[in-house]
Structure formats: C-alpha cells, structure tokens
C-alpha cells in the first residue's frame, strides 16, 4: 500500500490527473466553510456516491466542478469505481469498507491541503 505522499506523486505523473486545480471560488468556499465541513462533505460524497456495491451511473456520478471535493476526486482518481479499480485495484461490485472510505477521504483532504498550500493557480 502506497503512502498518501507516494500516491499524490504518482497521480501528478498523469497528464489528466495533474490538470486539476482548485479555482479561486473553490478556495473561497473552503475558507468560508472550514476544513472540517469540507472533510464531512468528502465523507458523505464517498459514502453515498462511491461506496455502494452498485453505482447506477458509474463514471458519471462525480461532477467536474461545483465543489472542491469533486475536483479532488478527479485529481485523485477517486471519482468512480472504474477509476478506483484502475488506480488502486479496488474491486468493482462490492461495497467499500469503512477503512477504504476513510483512506479515500484522507487522500482527498491531503490533495486539497496541498492545493491550498500551493496558492492560486
């Protein structure tokens, strides 16, 4: 199992994943809501949109914009079960465990924190 840092470095080598960045609007939303709220949103999105064994619209359940967590999901290849399978070898067709959900949320939050530390793009 890779560390979060190793995973983020690997994701940066993907031209598609590396193109995602938080917008100024996303950054302001995070500042207004606070990281605790963003983390709760991330946990809720993962639990409801990614964790079920069967996701009816897999590959289309995560919008490309509209919330900082959505951007992080695409940047971290945690946007759909197909990407989770391709990048992290998480089997499709079974519910994500609580531990898997927590690891995904930690990865998303680490990506968001890194984006905030880098400043505006």
PLM-predicted stretches and their roles:
Residues 82-108:
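Iron-sulfur (Fe-S) cluster-binding segments and ferredoxin-like electron-carrier domains
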Residues 3, 86-90, 114:
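RNA-interacting cores
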Residues 40-48, 82-86, 110:
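Short, hydrophobic/amphipathic alpha-helical patches that form generic packing surfaces
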Residues 102-121:
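Short Fe-S-cluster ligation motifs
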Residues 56-76:
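Immediate flanking context of iron-sulfur cluster ligation sites
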Residues 1-47:
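Core of compact, soluble alpha-helical bundle domains
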């Amino acid at each position: 199992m890779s560390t979060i840092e190793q995973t983020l470095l690997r994701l940066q080598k993907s031209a598609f994943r590396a193109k995602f960045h938080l917008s100024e609007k996303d950054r302001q939303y995070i500042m207004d809501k606070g990281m605790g709220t963003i983390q709760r949103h991330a946990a809720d999105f993962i639990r409801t949109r990614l964790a079920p064994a069967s996701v009816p619209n897999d590959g289309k359940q995560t919008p490309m914009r509209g919330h900082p967590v959505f951007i992080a999901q695409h940047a971290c290849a945690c946007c759909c079960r197909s990407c989770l399978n391709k990048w992290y070898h998480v089997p499709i067709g079974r519910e994500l465990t609580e531990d898997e959900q927590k690891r995904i949320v930690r990865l998303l939050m680490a990506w968001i924190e890194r984006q905030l530390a880098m400043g505006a793009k």
